[in-house]
């Protein structure tokens, strides 16, 4: 068991990358 902070940070980072990659 890790924590919600780690998942939240990873999720945020992935979301940012996704937006940056799919920035039309």
Curated annotation (Swiss-Prot):
Q: Which GO terms describe its cellular component?
A: mitochondrial inner membrane; respiratory chain complex IV
Which UniProt key words apply to this protein?
A: Heme, Iron, Membrane, Metal-binding, Mitochondrion, Mitochondrion inner membrane
The places in or outside the cell where this protein is found are:
Mitochondrion inner membrane
A GO term, aspect molecular function: metal ion binding
User: InterPro entries annotated for this entry?
Assistant: Cyt_c_oxidase_su5A/6_sf
> Topology relative to the membrane, per the entry?
Peripheral membrane protein
Keyword Heme assigned to the entry: answer is yes
The biological process GO terms on file are: mitochondrial electron transport, cytochrome c to oxygen
Which pathway does the UniProt entry assign to this protein?
A: Energy metabolism; oxidative phosphorylation
Function recorded in the entry? Component of the cytochrome c oxidase, the last enzyme in the mitochondrial electron transport chain which drives oxidative phosphorylation. The respiratory chain contains 3 multisubunit complexes succinate dehydrogenase (complex II, CII), ubiquinol-cytochrome c oxidoreductase (cytochrome b-c1 complex, complex III, CIII) and cytochrome c oxidase (complex IV, CIV), that cooperate to transfer electrons derived from NADH and succinate to molecular oxygen, creating an electrochemical gradient over the inner membrane that drives transmembrane transport and the ATP synthase.
- How does this chain assemble? Component of the cytochrome c oxidase (complex IV, CIV), a multisubunit enzyme composed of 14 subunits. The complex is composed of a catalytic core of 3 subunits MT-CO1, MT-CO2 and MT-CO3, encoded in the mitochondrial DNA, and 11 supernumerary subunits COX4I, COX5A, COX5B, COX6A, COX6B, COX6C, COX7A, COX7B, COX7C, COX8 and NDUFA4, which are encoded in the nuclear genome.
Identify its protein family.
Belongs to the cytochrome c oxidase subunit 5A family.
UniProt protein name: Cytochrome c oxidase subunit 5A-2, mitochondrial
